[in-house]
Design a protein with these regions (language model features):
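A residue-level marker of the well-folded mature domains of exported/periplasmic proteins
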Residues: 1-245
Length: 245
């Protein structure tokens, strides 16, 4: 029986035949590129910016793509000393968040803010891999940070986070239209039912420990205050009432 892993890859199982997901490396790249543009890092000169990091569950293979994709963009600025992490918490396992939990993200950032930013040090940017962790960061900032609001990334366009984008409490989120993923998965199932090859566009990236799994990667999109209306409301993904409730 063919098995299609949906969005999250099943690891260490030879039962998985195909994988339908988003281009998770590109999710991280988009977050990194947003930070570069928002801070104009290419023209930073001798300026330095303080950055902190948070990603998701250490058992979720996707964090490797989200986090590493973003770091691939930011690394030159880290190496040049333009981006500095006052907490020193930079390793993926250190900045991971069990179960992607908002309360755990909030608790960790409240500790970071108290330990490294309570003296007036400016926090310039937080690379958050997704919206549930970004929400925890935003909650921590609201409760215990008095500096200029940092650039804050996210992913998923959860309703609470889109509200934060509108309110200026989150800079961006990467939109992964689940309608696209569902539609592509249906195509894959239909092909298998007909005895034909399902659509795939990646045969190199996703190794679940038993081999590379043929995958279809849907395209993620940046969501900001400038395009959320078109991307989320006009497309029918959310209604105005969803965001005003």
């Amino acid at each position: 029986i063919p098995v299609i892993a949906y969005d999250r890859l099943i690891m260490n199982s030879d039962a998985v035949c195909y994988y339908a997901t988003f281009d998770n490396w590109d999710v991280g790249v988009k977050q990194g590129e947003y930070i570069v543009d928002a801070l104009d890092l290419e023209n930073a000169g001798d300026k330095t910016y303080n950055i902190e990091y948070i990603t998701g569950d250490p058992g979720d293979n996707n964090i490797n793509f989200f986090f590493d994709g973003a770091i691939s963009v930011l690394q030159p600025y880290i190496d040049a000393g333009t981006l500095v992490c006052p907490s020193g918490q930079t390793e993926k396992q250190t900045v991971a968040t069990a179960n992607w939990a908002t309360d755990a993200a909030q608790a960790r950032f409240e500790n970071i803010l108290a330990s490294y930013y309570s003296d007036g040090t400016q926090l310039d940017v937080v690379l958050a891999s997704n919206d549930s962790t970004a929400l925890g960061v935003a909650n921590a900032l609201a409760s215990s940070y008095t500096g200029n609001y940092p650039v804050l990334t996210g992913q998923d366009c959860d309703i609470a986070n889109v509200k934060n984008i509108v309110a200026g409490k989150q800079s961006m989120s990467v939109f992964k239209d689940t309608r696209d993923l569902a539609s592509k998965t249906v195509e894959m199932v239909d092909a298998l039912m007909k005895g034909t090859e399902p659509p795939v566009n990646d045969t190199e990236t996703y190794d679940n420990g038993t081999g590379v799994i043929p995958s279809y990667l849907c395209e993620p999109k940046d969501c900001t205050i400038d395009n959320y209306q078109e991307l989320l409301i006009d497309s029918g993904y959310y209604t105005e009432a969803d965001l005003n409730g």
